[in-house]
């Protein structure tokens, strides 16, 4: 690989955080094209840069006999983490919406109340991504050279 997984994944955390922060600027008058779509594209690119190297890193050094089990554990952890994360951010959005409704004495279906809840959830999401990026850089020590050495060890010469 040209770049190590630490840098690629950190770049993904940066992009995803930036996209999430763009979503915190939403208002009830926001439209899809200039406000939402660019942020969603940036978040998607960032997540792609996070999950591909993360998978390679998680399976790095796992013996051939254990690759299937390690991959299954990784996929299970990603599914559970995604479900818990969505539930957590949904709870944040719902709680923030309820707090806004009570504080401002507005209808719960008022667009400003809904957007307030979403903005709080996007802010928390950005914070979680920042924390993930910091933990990634602090804890993952696999370099590009390590990954290349693993690729060379896995190759077989054919005559």
Task: For each feature predicted by the language model, list its residue ranges.
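C-terminal module of multi-pass small-molecule transporters
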Residues: 1-148
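Short, intrinsically disordered terminal tails adjacent to the first/last structured region
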Residues: 150-159
């Amino acid at each position: 690989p040209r770049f190590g997984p630490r840098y690629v994944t950190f770049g993904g955390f940066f992009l995803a955080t930036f996209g999430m922060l763009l979503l915190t600027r939403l208002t009830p008058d926001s439209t899809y094209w200039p406000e939402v779509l660019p942020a969603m594209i940036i978040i998607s690119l960032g997540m792609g840069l996070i999950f591909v190297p993360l998978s390679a890193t998680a399976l790095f050094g796992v013996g051939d006999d254990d690759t299937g089990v390690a991959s299954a554990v990784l996929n299970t952890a990603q599914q559970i983490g995604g479900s818990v994360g969505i539930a957590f951010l949904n709870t944040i959005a719902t709680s923030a919406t309820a707090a806004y409704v009570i504080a401002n004495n507005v209808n719960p279906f008022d667009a400003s109340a809904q957007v307030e809840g979403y903005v709080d959830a996007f802010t928390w999401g950005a914070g979680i991504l920042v924390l993930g990026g910091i933990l990634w850089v602090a804890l993952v020590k696999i370099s590009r050279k390590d990954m290349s050495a693993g690729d060379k060890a896995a190759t077989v010469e054919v005559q």
